[in-house]
Amino acid sequence: AYDIDYKRLFDIGYRGIIFDIDNTLVPHGADADFAAESLFSRLNELGFAVILLTDNDESRTARFNKNIGALYICNAEKPDPAPYNEAVKMLGLKKDEVIVIGDSMFKDILGAYNASIASIMVKYIGDGKKWLGWHRYMEYALLFAWHFGRYYKKLGGIGLTEKSSFFKNFKLFLKHEMLFCDISPACYK
């Protein structure tokens, strides 16, 4: 989430951002750190309206949001499109002016798709100690298949810097335990 060119997003017409919290902005359960606070300050300077959309409860969300001061929706039950639509309404924008940023294909990105909102999948932020859940394996399989599909041939990689790195990481995955973000180069950092 920290490597995205937000000025470019603003220049092409986006005015609102819906953020996931855990593993997108900070490791799971962590409070907002200096990087997160700086990011939100920069987004405000650029003119973005920002809202947090999370499956976390009120106390966790409020704790993260203490120094950020963003709007938020907690207990969202993603990928249900209703909270995404509510977030757009709270921002006071149209869907084509809003983009979702999250780390989970089956929650954040699928929810955005279900609500007809653009999205960016970012690299999972983790401490490296937790092993992947089943949905991370499914994400890996889908991103692997992306490389052989017609849209990849048409559109190219999604944030790829080195074409062969995907296959190199796949070989490493077979030999060692790795987090999803270490496997897939198809995400922002």
Enumerate the predicted regions with their spans.
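Asp-based, Mg2+/Mn2+-dependent phosphohydrolase catalytic module
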Residues: 1-19, 25-31, 37-100, 104-189
